[in-house]
Amino acid sequence: MRYIDLLIERQKVTERYIKNINKYLQPIKKRAKKILGNGTKVYLFGSFLKGNFGPNSDIDILVVSPKAPIKAGKKSGILLYLKRGFSVYNPFEIHLTTPEIFENWYKKFIKKDIKEI
């Protein structure tokens, strides 16, 4: 398969996800709360929310929980679970963090364009 064919396929899949965004956001939220508990908050942020989403953009989702692991191994297992059943070309970039890191780091970069799911 040529590189251009891969890009075209990725764009088609991304358009399908965007068209039905809530169909995909709700399972992510439900799974996050199931595995990390009811204190978990899920947010949409980044270029998609700002309205300057382009062909190479992703859809940024931030999962904030007191139970969020710090270690990469545990974190990657949760991230895989949150995107279970999605296409390999899915446009979601899921960030998993604790409330402390959210307050002290993410809020420095995310000023106003953030929406709780």
Locate the predicted segments by residue.
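Residue-level detector of short, conserved catalytic/binding motifs and their immediate flanks
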Residues: 59
